[in-house]
């Protein structure tokens, strides 16, 4: 929290949140508003232990389609991020101006890199979560098939991490 927010009341801070962030907060789901992106989509972050609850609530609010799930690395020694882009494919009176939302989970590289799988909420998250695991090493708890999807099963390391050291030698294997 910055210095300006220290002197503000909790009501003033709640008013600074985006519409969806404020609604989650009022429903008891702790989150941090990250403002809006360059095209006006509301961004928010949640702790890993609140992700499943937050996404379940967002689906109830009308964000009924997981358009994209992925990961990225902020840089060597910095955090890994699992992100979720949800959109609404139906009109909801309460949220008619809001059609999409982005949720991020920030993970410290040297701590537990686990987040809940959203497979039970969105079946389409299956391969997206597997790809994020395969490239960044973020584990998705309770995923029905937590295996590599792009790299060979015995591959070591996470190729899209900024601190990944590329091996000098690759053993090519015939697929047959």
Swiss-Prot record:
Q: How does it sit in the membrane?
A: Peripheral membrane protein
Source superkingdom: Bacteria
Q: What is its main location?
A: membrane
| GO CC annotation | plasma membrane-derived thylakoid membrane
Please name the GO terms that the record assigns under molecular function: NADH dehydrogenase (ubiquinone) activity; quinone binding
What are the entry keywords?
Answer: Membrane, NAD, NADP, Plastoquinone, Quinone, Thylakoid, Translocase, Transport
Q: Which Pfam families match?
A: Complex1_30kDa (PF00329)
Role, per record: NDH-1 shuttles electrons from an unknown electron donor, via FMN and iron-sulfur (Fe-S) centers, to quinones in the respiratory and/or the photosynthetic chain. The immediate electron acceptor for the enzyme in this species is believed to be plastoquinone. Couples the redox reaction to proton translocation, and thus conserves the redox energy in a proton gradient. Cyanobacterial NDH-1 also plays a role in inorganic carbon-concentration.
Which HAMAP family does this one have? NDH1_NuoC
Entry protein name: NAD(P)H-quinone oxidoreductase subunit J
Q: Which organism is it from?
A: Prochlorococcus marinus (strain MIT 9515)
